């Protein structure tokens, strides 16, 4: 079986990023972004998707975390597109409803070739530690649009902001892992015969 993996590099005046992704992995990760909370969330996504993920990012953190977080999302999305190739045999759809103590998040994906984000996750607090919680939506938007997939995220319950975000990123991992999984009985999962 072909190993589905990709590497993406991005360099701007604001960030320098390298992402290595192996879809058919074991959930191993090595993350160095300068944004500890983002690393914590990406570790959850890697573990629950089964993707192997290595990310090294340097950004203008003296300004804020925005550019680094968004550009990591861009690169991870691009890596997913490259790793999945023509998407032959994938499940295409994946979803999860994930509890984390008080929080309950629904995450659904369609690896359709079309980027879209529907995000209905009220954040009780504007920050978790030093991390601006509005960056969760920015990251997911960059990931979905550059990964060319539909992503729906909805909070069903929750009061603790850390728990809410953790449920979202665990759900993202479960949903992406399911959608990307190969079913040997299938060709390209589209009546059009292609996904792009």
Swiss-Prot record:
| Reaction(s) catalysed by this chain's protein | D-erythro-1-(imidazol-4-yl)glycerol 3-phosphate = 3-(imidazol-4-yl)-2-oxopropyl phosphate + H2O
Extract the Gene3D superfamilies matched here.
Answer: Imidazole glycerol phosphate dehydratase, domain 1
Q: What class of enzyme is it?
A: lyase
- Keywords carried by this UniProt record: Amino-acid biosynthesis, Cytoplasm, Histidine biosynthesis, Lyase
The pathway that the record names for this protein is:
Amino-acid biosynthesis; L-histidine biosynthesis; L-histidine from 5-phospho-alpha-D-ribose 1-diphosphate: step 6/9
Entry's EC annotation: 4.2.1.19
**What are this entry's molecular-function GO terms?**
imidazoleglycerol-phosphate dehydratase activity
The subcellular location is:
Cytoplasm
According to the UniProt record, one GO cellular component term is: cytoplasm
Q: Which SUPFAM superfamilies match?
A: Ribosomal protein S5 domain 2-like
* One biological process term in Gene Ontology: L-histidine biosynthetic process
Q: Please, which domain of life does this record's source organism belong to?
A: Bacteria
User: Record's PROSITE patterns?
Assistant: IGP_DEHYDRATASE_1, IGP_DEHYDRATASE_2
* Major site of localization recorded for this protein: cytoplasm
Q: Which family does it belong to?
A: Belongs to the imidazoleglycerol-phosphate dehydratase family.
- NCBIfam families reported for this sequence: PRK00951.2-1, PRK00951.2-4
User: Could you identify this protein by its name?
Assistant: Imidazoleglycerol-phosphate dehydratase
């Amino acid at each position: 079986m072909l190993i589905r993996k990709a590497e993406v590099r991005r360099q701007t005046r604001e960030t320098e990023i390298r992402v290595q992704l192996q879809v058919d992995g074991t959930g191993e990760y090595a993350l160095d972004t300068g944004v500890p909370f983002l690393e914590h969330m990406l570790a959850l996504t890697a573990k629950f998707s089964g993707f192997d993920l290595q990310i090294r990012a340097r950004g203008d953190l003296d300004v804020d975390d925005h550019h680094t977080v968004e550009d990591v999302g861009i690169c991870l999305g691009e890596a997913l597109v490259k790793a999945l190739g023509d998407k032959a045999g994938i499940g295409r759809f994946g979803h999860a409803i994930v509890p984390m103590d008080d929080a309950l998040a629904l995450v659904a994906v369609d690896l359709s070739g079309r980027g879209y984000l529907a995000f209905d996750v009220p954040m009780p607090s504007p920050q978790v530690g030093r991390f601006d919680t509005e960056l969760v939506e920015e990251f997911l938007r960059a990931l979905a649009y550059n990964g060319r997939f539909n992503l729906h995220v909805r909070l069903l319950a929750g009061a603790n902001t850390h728990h809410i975000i953790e449920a979202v990123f665990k759900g993202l991992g479960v949903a992406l892992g399911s959608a990307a999984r190969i079913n040997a009985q299938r060709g390209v999962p589209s009546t059009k015969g292609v996904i792009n």
